């Protein structure tokens, strides 16, 4: 479903990757999945030396992409790294809840169990 959702989102939004992964591995994974062309920029923790959920990497990503915090949405499947990190800097979050987790310490902006739900949310 990822490619279907990305082909819907890419013409409407600027899409970026913010990952704790390594550049070579992330690029390879994206190319093999056929999704590398949908993203405008890849920002990795190795670029800054700080990993999500630390606020510095979110601020760095906003600056590197010339994005506004209030207009940004972190979509992620890691509660701690993606959702807690984004929440900590005041960024909207969309939690891809593959585990079916229900014990949230706070309510994310959006929560979904299927990536196709992004099309309806956005």
Predicted segments — roles?
Residues 11-12:
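Structured helix-beta-strand junction loops
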